[in-house]
């Protein structure tokens, strides 16, 4: 096993951080199973988390509710633990359209997905690190509670090689094939190996560097880590463990056993359907399942094989699937970031998944065992968590209940900054008043966030501000995580001064340039104007020395009053601490390079340099162009489209594709030339007519 965590921080804990670190660490060593950290915006919660993780010294899972914040956490924790294994585990889908059936229109939607190879590598690296070391931090989304291969099989099928070991070359090759590695002597890619005489070179599915095994007869003479492109030796190794190329591993006996169980379940289910008079459903189910069984027996897999995972893994009906949490040792730690959002998200996953699959089962598209290919229910998740720290600026009732009302507060910031000044102003004349405040921030080089209640109001306000010469952008619900990060970067770098939206970045993102948050119609009770939402939104200005929040409303609602009272309480604590210790608040400043690093999305570009050039205006928006300009634009759009796909951004890639068709049409190329010869996927046997739903959904 490797050495424990070594924390590298450019500064010592300050403000409330030392007390919070001590209380949380003491609670862990005391045996407190669930704790809650209330950390105000800008108080350095990630720094506190890193210190607690280092003190505990055991593998840790950090959960976030979306990929954007997970990417930010991954980058921050990687900088805190540069010599330890900080890994990233999110959905590996670039694009994911789940299988579904809509009875009202008799529409069957076949599963459609595109897997990102880089993310798949990071997922495999995360689990292999857990098998090898204790100093592991894995940053994950809700993907952590979805089905994964059995960790016992994953460990048992590992191929262990050491210098001086007696083993025949062909035995090594057979072992590699048995864990899903492919021999490819031409293209040396991830998850492949190649053979040159008594030398075997392997590129593990979870690594970027390859391994060279040199034999002398039936003895391993040398093991080296090499560059897969140049073949140059990087380091000599005494031993090497090669873990499977996939999390789900099957063999012939397993497939045969699973096929028998599937046939038994099929016979039982067909009898039930026929007895209920559902003859069409019975015929459909029999045709589809028999087709899948034939594919399983012939090639070892089939479309939708995950729906038979219960039989393949040998689980009982209703038994939960294995997931990432099963790969951790017994004494690991779970940290739930923005727990007021993440915990309810975990709780909601099971019901949504079951509702969709239940329709497939009822109408004969799937066997009932498909329901057991599912995420964990909340109680199962909690039963697998030995120690839990919830982290939020606004803990919800669930966290308070789980931690029995005991909360560790981190209210005082290391910078001495106070919570934003709050003002309540009337609705009448709010836009003119807002414009006056924006002008003042423009002169100081500061930024403004404006949040409204409706899309129409956001659009109208953005148009008005643009007419008044304000550099403003509008963030709407159609913008995905990657574009959102690009907009945040533009705001922080001063490409524009004002960002307008409905539910603007309430949680997590670091924007110290924002000095004013304006909340329009703050007196309208509802989810977007609850006390927790208001506190989170107000917190977007908490990292600026001149932080201020204006709540526009003609009355003070209960939610507004609670948000005002809590902000006032925090400001009082912070001010008294500063006065007692002679602290002068100082603002947070970031260089351009730091802003670019923090706002890059780590999903697939974590180790790539540079970005694709942004495409110019759409053909429909531009003035007439020369043929040369249009051909240049085609190249730009193609590059941007590929980059969007690599960055887990299928929706943007589709929009860029449509723009590409438009420009090619202007060039006189037929759309079919651009689209290629793609054919519609074939319907599974016995399925209803398929109609592709408009737009899939991004992987979790």
Curated annotation (Swiss-Prot):
Pfam family, one: UVR
Keywords from the UniProt entry: ATP-binding, Cytoplasm, DNA damage, DNA excision, DNA repair, Excision nuclease, Helicase, Hydrolase, Nucleotide-binding, SOS response
Function in brief: The UvrABC repair system catalyzes the recognition and processing of DNA lesions. A damage recognition complex composed of 2 UvrA and 2 UvrB subunits scans DNA for abnormalities. Upon binding of the UvrA(2)B(2) complex to a putative damaged site, the DNA wraps around one UvrB monomer. DNA wrap is dependent on ATP binding by UvrB and probably causes local melting of the DNA helix, facilitating insertion of UvrB beta-hairpin between the DNA strands. Then UvrB probes one DNA strand for the presence of a lesion.
Residue ranges of domain Helicase C-terminal in the record: 430-596
Chain intervals for the UniProt region annotation (Disordered): 608-627, 667-700
Lineage, top ranks: Bacteria, Pseudomonadati, Gemmatimonadota, Gemmatimonadia, Gemmatimonadales
Entry-linked InterPro entries: Helicase/UvrB_N, Helicase_ATP-bd, Helicase_C-like, P-loop_NTPase, UVR_dom, UVR_dom_sf, UvrB, UvrB_inter
GO CC terms: cytoplasm; excinuclease repair complex
Gene (UniProt): uvrB
Family of the protein in this entry: Belongs to the UvrB family.
Protein's recorded name: UvrABC system protein B
Subunit structure comment from the entry: Forms a heterotetramer with UvrA during the search for lesions. Interacts with UvrC in an incision complex.
Domain Helicase ATP-binding: 26-183
GO molecular function annotation: ATP binding; ATP hydrolysis activity; DNA binding; excinuclease ABC activity; helicase activity
């Amino acid at each position: 096993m490797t050495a424990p965590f070594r924390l590298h921080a450019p500064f010592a804990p300050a403000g409330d951080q030392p007390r919070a670190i001590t209380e949380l660490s003491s609670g862990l060593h005391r045996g407190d199973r669930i704790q809650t950290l209330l950390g105000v915006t800008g108080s350095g919660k990630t720094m506190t988390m890193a210190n607690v993780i280092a003190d505990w010294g055991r593998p840790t899972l950090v959960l976030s509710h979306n990929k954007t914040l997970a990417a930010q956490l991954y980058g921050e924790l990687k900088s805190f633990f540069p010599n330890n294994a900080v890994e990233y585990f999110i959905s590996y889908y670039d694009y994911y359209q789940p299988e579904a059936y809509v009875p009202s229109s008799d529409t069957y939607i076949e599963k459609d997905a595109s897997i990102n190879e880089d993310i798949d590598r990071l997922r495999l690296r995360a689990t292999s690190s857990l098998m090898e070391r204790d100093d592991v931090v894995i940053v994950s989304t809700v993907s952590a509670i979805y089905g994964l291969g059995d960790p016992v099989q994953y460990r048992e099928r590992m191929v262990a090689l050491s210098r001086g070991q007696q083993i025949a070359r062909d035995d090594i090759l057979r072992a590699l094939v048995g864990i899903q590695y492919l021999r490819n002597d031409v293209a040396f890619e991830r998850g492949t190996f190649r053979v040159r005489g008594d030398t075997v070179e392997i590129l593990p599915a979870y690594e970027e560097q390859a391994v060279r095994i040199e034999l002398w007869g039936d003895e391993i003479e040398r093991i080296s880590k090499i560059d897969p492109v140049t073949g140059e030796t990087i380091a000599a190794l005494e031993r090497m463990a090669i873990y499977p190329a996939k999390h789900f591993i099957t063999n012939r006996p397993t497939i045969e056993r699973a096929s028998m169980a599937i046939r038994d379940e099929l016979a039982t289910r067909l009898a039930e359907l026929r007895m209920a008079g559902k003859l069409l459903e019975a015929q459909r189910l029999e045709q589809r399942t028999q087709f899948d069984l034939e594919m399983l027996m012939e090639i070892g897999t089939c479309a939708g094989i995950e729906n038979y995972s219960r039989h393949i893994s040998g689980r009982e009906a209703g038994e939960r699937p294995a997931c990432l949490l099963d790969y951790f040792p017994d004494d690991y730690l779970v940290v739930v970031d923005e727990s007021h959002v993440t915990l309810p998200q975990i709780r909601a996953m099971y019901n949504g998944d079951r509702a969709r699959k239940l329709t497939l089962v009822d109408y004969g598209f799937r066997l009932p065992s498909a329901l057991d290919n599912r995420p964990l229910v909340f109680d199962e998740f909690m039963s697998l968590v030995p120690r839990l720290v919830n982290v939020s600026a606004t803990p919800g009732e669930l966290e308070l209940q789980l931690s029995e009302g005991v909360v560790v507060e981190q209210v005082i910031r290391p910078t001495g900054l106070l919570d934003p000044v709050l003002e309540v102003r009337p609705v009448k004349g709010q836009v003119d008043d807002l414009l006056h405040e924006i002008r003042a921030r423009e002169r100081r080089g500061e930024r403004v966030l404006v949040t409204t209640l409706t899309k129409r109001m956001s659009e109208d306000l953005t148009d008005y501000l643009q007419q008044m010469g304000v550099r403003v952008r509008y963030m709407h619900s159609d913008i995905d995580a990657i574009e959102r990060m690009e907009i945040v970067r533009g705001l922080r770098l001063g490409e524009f001064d004002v960002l307008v939206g409905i539910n603007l970045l309430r949680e997590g993102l670091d924007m110290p340039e924002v000095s004013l948050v304006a909340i329009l119609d703050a007196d309208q009770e509802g989810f977007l104007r609850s006390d927790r939402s208001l506190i989170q939104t107000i917190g977007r200005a908490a990292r600026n020395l001149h932080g201020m929040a204006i709540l526009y409303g003609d009355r003070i609602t209960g939610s507004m009053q609670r948000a005002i009272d809590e902000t006032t309480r925090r400001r009082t604590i912070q001010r008294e601490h500063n006065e007692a210790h002679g602290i002068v608040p100082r603002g947070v400043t970031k260089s351009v390079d730091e802003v670019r690093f923090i706002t890059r999305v780590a999903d697939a570009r974590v180790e790539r340099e540079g970005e694709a050039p942004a495409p110019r205006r759409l053909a429909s928006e531009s003035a007439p162009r020369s043929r040369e300009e249009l051909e240049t634009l085609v190249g730009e759009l193609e590059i941007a489209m590929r980059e969007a796909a690599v960055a887990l951004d299928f929706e943007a890639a589709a929009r860029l594709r449509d723009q590409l068709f438009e420009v090619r049409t202007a060039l006189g190329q037929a759309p079919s030339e651009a689209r290629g010869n793609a054919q519609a996927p074939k319907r599974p046997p016995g399925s209803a007519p398929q109609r592709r739903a408009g737009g899939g959904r991004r992987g979790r």
